[in-house]
Amino acid sequence: MGLPWYRVHTVVLNDPGRLIAVHLMHTALVSGWAGSMALYELAVFDPSDPVLDPMWRQGMFVIPFMTRLGVTQSWGGWSITGETVTNAGLWSYEGVAAVHIVLSGLLFLAAIWHWVYWDLELFRDERTGKPSLDLPKIFGIHLFLSGVLCFGFGAFHVTGLFGPGVWVSDPYGLTGRVQPVAPAWGAEGFDPFNPGGIASHHIAAGILGILAGLFHLSVRPPQRLYKGLRMGNVETVLSSSIAAVFFAAFVVAGTMWYGCAATPVELFGPTRYQWDQGYFQQEIDRRIRNSVAENVSLSEAWSKIPEKLAFYDYIGNNPAKGGLFRAGAMDNGDGIAVGWLGHAVFKDKEGNELFVRRMPTFFETFPVVLVDEEGIVRADVPFRRAESKYSIEQVGVSVEFYGGELNGVSFSDPATVKKYARRAQLGEIFEFDRATLKSDGVFRSSPRGWFTFGHACFALLFFFGHLWHGSRTLFRDVFAGIDPDLDSQVEFGLFQKLGDPTTRKQTV
């Protein structure tokens, strides 16, 4: 045919059999990729430390999505929560991957069958004998079936009626596990962090989809609307489908980046706003205050802080710290976290407590500044020692650790104090193994960042695709250079040029 690369999809225009074939092949590729990627991730995933080396630190992308839907066990004998497993059953990580690969193979065979047997009676209009599709009817069928699926997911899978439930956690990502969820039908169902809204919204949207599907199956579109929206043209279907996909992509980019019940921090890592707002720092501070109010020593109070909570309060886990073109998992950046050194408390020689000002998200370097409880600068690591007034040496700053591996240890020599002050800029202080993976010390983003970036980019791309194909189908006559009021029939396809005066015409 000599088609240019950007027009190859015209081969499935007016060819319903092969249109089905290419969609089957596309689904086969998607399913095959998902299964293969899952097996690859399982091959490189280390489940030994779910606290300091969780899936999101290791750059896992499909494992978090399987986990949030209720898959937590492996045929390898491990569970995502750290327990050993004897019988994982079919719906393990490997089982789900295998099912996707088998499905991919079946879809591949179906695609070949439909490509070979493309000219079926089913696709021919009884009146004209030409290939045609009843697009409004097909729309109704698809709407009905997707409504059934949506309702089934919300009413059975999420609620645990027939299924495992979904991943549910506390606001600080400490107690996450898979459990059934009761639908939330009140105003609380609109809270993006309430998992009950996932169940109720799927049930409601499913019912709406079923009713809308039945409506479109039983009611024909008015002629004016049918013609106005070009409902007989398959490019209209392409245009509206792209619109649905780009809208969904924009929505999930937002829910992933800003966080919601469907994107828990245990599976995808913290959001950047939790660092910006000191979210975990405030919770740690609240717990310490409560412990001290109960006459518990500072050392004991900090020892009660879960290592998991302290690790969230570290800038290296902020997805906005990794550059978009720094490939690799977080562990390839600052290394594999080995242990929490403890909370560093800085004091001047008078015994006043000083607080290291934390690095904002979009800074790579930041001055080391220590302030008192009123926010007044009391000490720093100066850029020019000759002009310094508040240097660690001049102010006589010391550091003592509470909780963690250095619990009860204090340092007063300036070099060590400066070292820990620099590290305290980045939140809680952890020890990292950079040798195992040859980590380069440059922060990476988490799967939360990659997912958001990918979906935002594709949504923008698909938005323009929607405008393009929508314009093509609505203004087809204009682009073809044909006046819709023309009283002569034009033989399409005989000439390549638009508006060619030599095109064969036949007066009606």
Swiss-Prot record:
UniProt protein name: Photosystem II CP47 reaction center protein
Disulfide bonding pattern of the chain: none
Family the entry assigns: Belongs to the PsbB/PsbC family. PsbB subfamily.
Encoding gene (name): psbB
Gene3D superfamilies reported for this sequence: Photosystem II CP47 reaction center protein (3.10.680.10)
Taxonomic lineage from the root: Eukaryota, Viridiplantae, Streptophyta, Zygnematophyceae, Zygnematophycidae
Entry function: One of the components of the core complex of photosystem II (PSII). It binds chlorophyll and helps catalyze the primary light-induced photochemical processes of PSII. PSII is a light-driven water:plastoquinone oxidoreductase, using light energy to abstract electrons from H(2)O, generating O(2) and a proton gradient subsequently used for ATP formation.
GO cellular component, as recorded: chloroplast thylakoid membrane; photosystem II
InterPro entries assigned: PS_antenna-like, PS_II_antenna-like_sf, PSII_PsbB
Gene source species: Zygnema circumcarinatum
PANTHER family: PHOTOSYSTEM II CP43 REACTION CENTER PROTEIN (PTHR33180:SF37)
GO biological process: photosynthetic electron transport in photosystem II
Membrane association type: Multi-pass membrane protein
Pfam families: PSII
Subunit structure: PSII is composed of 1 copy each of membrane proteins PsbA, PsbB, PsbC, PsbD, PsbE, PsbF, PsbH, PsbI, PsbJ, PsbK, PsbL, PsbM, PsbT, PsbX, PsbY, PsbZ, Psb30/Ycf12, at least 3 peripheral proteins of the oxygen-evolving complex and a large number of cofactors. It forms dimeric complexes.
Record's keyword terms, sorted: Chlorophyll, Chloroplast, Chromophore, Membrane, Photosynthesis, Photosystem II, Plastid, Thylakoid, Transmembrane, Transmembrane helix
A single GO molecular function term of this UniProt record: electron transporter, transferring electrons within the cyclic electron transport pathway of photosynthesis activity
Co-factor binding comment: Binds multiple chlorophylls. PSII binds additional chlorophylls, carotenoids and specific lipids.
Keyword Transmembrane: yes
Superkingdom in the source lineage: Eukaryota
Positions of transmembrane segments: 21-36, 101-115, 140-156, 203-218, 237-252, 457-472
Localization of this protein: Plastid, Chloroplast thylakoid membrane
